């Protein structure tokens, strides 16, 4: 293995020793209500920390307890899993169960979700490594660019783009004087580079071509059940075909960025990154399997339900523990945490095949959102919807202010609409706020300065939404 200028240990992000109570508190910052679901995922995450502290023999025997969340759309199922993955810096993949077909049918097989998770893990580790070496890469990129702009006589490693107007000291006889003059000129160029005075200049860089694994012509094998063949072909051709550099003409800021990426790639130890990515996907990976209820066949049904049952049977070995070949090597799925979710309007969890039910031992029912929950969703989270709209419109100089009675009226309308029509949970708030703020969002940039302060109170909400609410047919399609 080649020696690398920087050989930093790649480890997972500093995982805090969070207790289940602390995990729930962090989830509370972003998600309203759903205490039972938060407790279940908090315990699952804490058990991973506990497992790491055991001796290797016992550690191998302890498997994650997969979770199935039951509840209507828009109550926080996906958000809980997403926030959980951010807490532990784990590779996280959200997939829809309906996208997969059983082996033998046209479409993606369930093993492809593990391959996708492996790619996510690899990218996560690479990004963390690049962050660690960012300063070093910037310094090296700056020196490389200066070598191009003002090279030593006969030296130009990356490309051409020498800027004229600076003496190359051919007229200076003394070698020491020439060197001093060159260094002074180089520092002068460095100052111009840092202050942006060279941003309009163009340079020609000799940069590595994208690897053959990224060549689009091979993606014909990317569909269906041929992912393994695709990976093998790309890996083989990547080793056989020579890697060539490509000359590109770029402006200074773009050239600097390209060189930074190139230098960071040189500092990267591929074997170490691959090992860490493999460890993380096996030990920390989380797969959120949404719409699990859509592959549950109802009793007495036939036809398409046969294929649905096939997908369930294909899921069994993946959830239980299997080995899947991926781009980063064979991945064991034994300790990947699976969180399934579904509304189960037309079906119930018992409609899943018994073997799959047994592999999701923890079941959590999420509560329907109340009017008070809607009020909290609008105001409590640090990035609540009201704060998002205030920030967006402030870029046009519009000062948006939501009063308490305005918040209460929006929450009441959202709750009533969910009761009268389809219950889409908190997503109803997005629809209502877009309709409510449509006028100010459109007219805002053209308003005079005196009219750029807009107060959203109960009367404002009623005036703009009353007509739509009263018309049942209209409210069904607009709100």
Curated annotation (Swiss-Prot):
It comes from Leptospira interrogans serogroup Icterohaemorrhagiae serovar Lai (strain 56601). GO terms for biological process: protein unfolding; proteolysis involved in protein catabolic process. SMART domains: AAA, ClpB_D2-small. Keywords: ATP-binding, Chaperone, Cytoplasm, Nucleotide-binding. InterPro entries: AAA+_ATPase, ATP-dep_Clp_protease_ClpX, ATPase_AAA_core, ATPase_dyneun-rel_AAA, Clp_ATPase_C, HslU, P-loop_NTPase. Gene3D superfamilies: 1.10.8.60, P-loop containing nucleotide triphosphate hydrolases (3.40.50.300). This is ATP-dependent protease ATPase subunit HslU. It holds the Pfam family AAA_2. A double ring-shaped homohexamer of HslV is capped on each side by a ring-shaped HslU homohexamer. The assembly of the HslU/HslV complex is dependent on binding of ATP. ATPase subunit of a proteasome-like degradation complex; this subunit has chaperone activity. The binding of ATP and its subsequent hydrolysis by HslU are essential for unfolding of protein substrates subsequently hydrolyzed by HslV. HslU recognizes the N-terminal part of its protein substrates and unfolds these before they are guided to HslV for hydrolysis. It is found in: Cytoplasm. Belongs to the ClpX chaperone family. HslU subfamily. ATP binds at residues 32, 74-79, 290, 355, 427. GO terms for cellular component: HslUV protease complex. One of its GO terms (molecular function) is proteasome-activating activity.
